[in-house]
């Protein structure tokens, strides 16, 4: 979908090289590695999975207007079943525009810092997800202090109560998938929780 600021247009082999659109994008003071993130959409049968690294930030187009790279990547990607959150779902990520394009049913947030638990962002992810019957958000680590602080927040009801390694198991030739949460305290990777199976195909 994207790499080094070059984003697929969504059909055929055409791309837009946003760093070439405006010379100001090449100014070292405005260089941002996040806009250069590699973004992938993985397909197996009807199942779709998105992973976009730290794909956030803006670049200038030929008219000097700001272009949100995350939203352009989401537009190229289209709807998916499961999405890894961009940039740890930090406050500059998972914009409304991006979420509207991918319409994922579940999101995985890789967390290694307390600040990666951003209430406004998670609330937005939960609110813009149609199916809330099961956990919508899976975090690799939920700091105890954050869990206690936000325990009464409505969005916490849509966050998996267990955290750890998140594994997506796709089967039946891509028609179904389950989400496993494994222990991350040591190398045993014990199964802590299993969610699903879910039907693939986000319409």
Where does each model-flagged region fall?
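Flexible, acidic/histidine-containing loops and adjacent segments that form or flank the divalent-metal
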Residues: 1-62, 129-203
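Cap/insert and terminal regions of metallo-dependent hydrolase folds
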Residues: 26-37, 56-158
